[in-house]
Amino acid sequence: MPSPASNTWINTTLPSSCSSPFKDLASTSSSPTTLLPFKKRSSSNTNTITCSLQTLHYPKQYQPTSTSTTTTPTPIKPTTTTTTTTPHRETKPLSDTKQPFPQKWNFLQKAAATGLDMVETALVSHESKHPLPKTADPKVQIAGNFAPVPEHAADQALPVVGKIPKCIDGVYVRNGANPLYEPVAGHHFFDGDGMVHAVKFTNGAASYACRFTETQRLAQEKSLGRPVFPKAIGELHGHSGIARLLLFYARSLFQLVDGSHGMGVANAGLVYFNNHLLAMSEDDLPYHVRITSNGDLTTVGRYDFNGQLNSTMIAHPKLDPVNGDLHALSYDVVQKPYLKYFRFSADGVKSPDVEIPLKEPTMMHDFAITENFVVVPDQQVVFKLTEMITGGSPVVYDKNKTSRFGILDKNAKDANAMRWIDAPECFCFHLWNAWEEPETDEIVVIGSCMTPADSIFNECDESLKSVLSEIRLNLRTGKSTRRPIISDAEQVNLEAGMVNRNKLGRKTQFAYLALAEPWPKVSGFAKVDLFSGEVQKYMYGEEKFGGEPLFLPNGEEEGDGYILAFVHDEKEWKSELQIVNAQNLKLEASIKLPSRVPYGFHGTFIHSKDLRKQA
């Protein structure tokens, strides 16, 4: 084992079980040795954190991103021992010589930095005396294949079992959370730095690369060699959360950090719009990421649509397949207006903001569009920052609130004509589609209704359920109805997925959704007939788990296409990209990947003809 001062990876044996809603983060069969590319904080303190089975060591300094060829680390097969293996390093180690402070800092800033670091050390010491909730415990949240990986430069001509369909020509990209630095306190899986994984297809061959999205936040933390920005979910709860906000504010006053150019992680969604690939999280503007000719990735920068966007944008904008417009929401947890709607024409021209009146800031992760309307959920998970004063989480399930859906004309200039329809006890983290049925004057919304509603954010005793549901909003009566699409006998947790995006906002028969079992892992995907409730399942295989299935259309027929999904073998500790025929659910090809792909979030596919016009 190299010394803690060297640039090494973390080798840790992970526990095989965990008594939490995230208990399945670790392998259920054996304890694989995992490669975690955390970077150690630049500090004179001992750079270790203690896990249940082994101590994790972190390198002192960050190695800058490079697009040059890297050495691929050798995947480590699972083992039941705690033997430590040192893989090949991805980049040349840096010298141990480091600047204690950035050279541009003056004496006052250096003194302030020293004092505030002492405050943080005391805060961390105080926090360590209290157990973290499992939804904020890094030993739970980023265990197993939820753990981060290092960047990987484009690797060409990957091994393929089977044959890649000729129609798959372009690049599949998927976003995910991948913390660069060791968490110093609480950490939720959603808090990690954004990393995009890309598989590029050319003439039946495939390449793979993964890169951090170089956010303003990440750039500043790299320059300091440590995490300094507060983590929205893992850290900001209770009195310690208030202390961390004050600590960040103090560092900002002395210009040690700067949050004025964005604090987001860009780890959730991806959309290709107006020749720009955008990486998004709802706490910031999008980031423009460019795909290189050899399939690698580079970050161009924070993207404000040529000066038109000056607020955050949620990670699930909706691209209208007919006219090419991009529809989006922006929400604010501090000040009114708490919610805004806007759209961009196909050539990138933004509409004026439409302020949507809400009494309190609400979790607004997703929404839906129809041919003529925007469907906005106003649900029971809300933000109450005052809860931190009494020691609680600011993300709250408000049992006294009635969930509702707002229907707004896509071209509305204000929210005066917006109609609200109550939908009691309904919380959908994601909405898969919506369409209009003029014969009954209804809007049909397809979503997965989740209970407990706040279980992703707050520790709950009740096990999570995610029920695929049809919600009907009657514009004539102002009433709603809701029914499960799948029968009770076949009920399974369905989360993450999509319909044919060429049919978005129009009536669709099929949805392709992740089988989120055993939660929070994904053991396969389901093709669901939204009319009959019939479920066809495709399982990734024994000890294999994946994430969001991406449906790639191939023709005019709705169900004609292929499913692409990253899959990780927890027994062999290797990852692959599976390509499945969406009509018969037969495996067409499996692309063997040169490095591990952690479980992540959402993705998209960009065809080669569109890539050639990339900005």
Swiss-Prot record:
Catalytic activity field: a 9-cis-epoxycarotenoid + O2 = a 12'-apo-carotenal + 2-cis,4-trans-xanthoxin; 9-cis-violaxanthin + O2 = (3S,5R,6S)-5,6-epoxy-3-hydroxy-5,6-dihydro-12'-apo-beta-caroten-12'-al + 2-cis,4-trans-xanthoxin; 9'-cis-neoxanthin + O2 = (3S,5R,6R)-3,5-dihydroxy-6,7-didehydro-5,6-dihydro-12'-apo-beta-caroten-12'-al + 2-cis,4-trans-xanthoxin
Any coiled-coil regions, as ranges: 571-592
Claim: Transmembrane is one of the keywords in the record: no
Swiss-Prot/TrEMBL cofactor(s): Fe(2+)
Listed Low complexity bias regions: 27-37, 64-86
Induction: By drought stress.
Entry EC no(s): 1.13.11.51
Gene Ontology molecular function terms on file: 9-cis-epoxycarotenoid dioxygenase activity; metal ion binding
Protein's UniProt name: 9-cis-epoxycarotenoid dioxygenase NCED1, chloroplastic
Species this protein is from: Phaseolus vulgaris (Kidney bean)
